Amino acid sequence: MDIAVIGSNMVDLITYTNQMPKEGETLEAPAFKIGCGGKGANQAVAAAKLNSKVLMLTKVGDDIFADNTIRNLESWGINTTYVEKVPCTSSGVAPIFVNANSSNSILIIKGANKFLSPEDIDRAAEDLKKCQLIVLQLEVQLETVYHAIEFGKKHGIEVLLNPAPALRELDMSYACKCDFFVPNETELEILTGMPVDTYDHIRAAARSLVDKGLNNIIVTMGEKGALWMTRDQEVHVPAFRVNAVDTSGAGDAFIGCFAHYYVQSGDVEAAMKKAVLFAAFSVTGKGTQSSYPSIEQFNEYLSLNE
C-alpha cells in the first residue's frame, strides 16, 4: 500500500442556490445532487484515481447509504477491509450549499464516523505498517487522530494532518509530530486567531505555527494557490485560473493529489504544483469525488497546462 486514509466518509447532500433563505423564509433552489463524500473518503478517492494504492479506515452506518459508500470506494480500487458498519447508527451526512459564486458552506453530521476508534487502528496495524503515508482529518474523534499520529511516529510512517473542520481544542503538540499540516485559510484563522484576509497575513499566521514547532505547513488558499512553509524556507505555488462551477471538495482534491505525488517522488514543491492543478480541474465540475479527474484525464490536463 502507498497511502492509508484514516478518517471520515459522508453522504453529500448538495443544494445549488442563488441565495440562502432567511429565518422563516422558503425559497426554491435550482438544483440538488447526492454524492459520496466526507473529507477522508474524498482524499482517498482523489489519490486512488491517480493510481495510488489506498487503504481506508472508516465507519459507515446501518442504513441505505452504507453499501453504496462501500461500493463507491471499491470501484476506485480502495482497500475496504477496515470499512465497517456500525449497527443502529446512521451514516455521516453533509448538507452542502453552493451559492451563485460557486462557493460552498457545509454542515456535517458525523454519524457512524464518531465510532472510529484507536482500537480500529491497532486492529489494522499490520496493513498500516506497509503504508508510506497516513492521511488524517478531524471529522472523527480526536483521540483516534492522536493515536494514528503516534502510530505513524512509532513505525516510521509519515503523517499528513488536514485540520478540517478546524477545532480550537486540537492539541498542537500532536500537530507538531506530523510531517505535514495542511489547513485552508479559514482553518488557519480559527487555529491561530490571526487575520488571513491578505497574503501577508496568511504568511504571518502560518509562521506563528511554524514557530510553535510545526515541521511543514501547507496552506491551501483557493484562487491564491498554496503556501508551503518550514523553519528554513517558504514557497508559494500560484493558482491556475479556471471558471469555477463548484468548489466543494477542492481542498480534499489537493490533499489526495499531493499525497499521491509526494509518495511517488518525495518532492514537496513538485507535488504541490500538481495538486494545485488537480484542485483547479475539480472546481470546473459539480460535486466532490465526481469532479476529480482520472489519471488519464489529469495527464492530459497537465500536458496542456504545466
UniProtKB/Swiss-Prot annotation:
Annotated control of activity: Activity is stimulated by certain monovalent cations, including NH(4+), Cs(+), Rb(+) and K(+). Inhibited by Na(+) and Li(+).
Record-linked Pfam families: PfkB (PF00294)
UniProt keywords, alphabetically: ATP-binding, Carbohydrate metabolism, Cytoplasm, Kinase, Magnesium, Metal-binding, Nucleotide-binding, Potassium, Transferase
Site (Important for substrate specificity): 10
Cofactor: Mg(2+)
Record's protein name: Deoxyribokinase
Enzyme Commission number(s): 2.7.1.229
GO BP annotations, alphabetical order: D-ribose metabolic process
Family under the similarity heading: Belongs to the carbohydrate kinase PfkB family. Deoxyribokinase subfamily.
Quaternary context: Homodimer.
Taxonomic superkingdom: Bacteria
Positions that bind K(+): 246, 248, 282, 285, 287, 291
An annotated Gene Ontology molecular function: ribokinase activity
SUPFAM superfamilies xrefs: Ribokinase-like
pH dependence: Optimum pH is 6.8-7.2.
Gene: deoK
UniProt-listed InterPro entries: PfkB_dom, Ribo/fructo_kinase, Ribokinase, Ribokinase-like
Catalytic function, reaction form: 2-deoxy-D-ribose + ATP = 2-deoxy-D-ribose 5-phosphate + ADP + H(+)
Free-text cofactor note: Has an absolute requirement for divalent cations which is best satisfied by Mg(2+). Can also use Co(2+), Cd(2+), Mn(2+), Ni(2+), Zn(2+) and Cu(2+), with lower efficiency.
Other remarks in the entry: Located in the deoQKPX locus, involved in 2-deoxy-D-ribose utilization. This locus is absent in E.coli K12.
Annotated binding of substrate, by residue: 10-12, 38-42, 139, 252
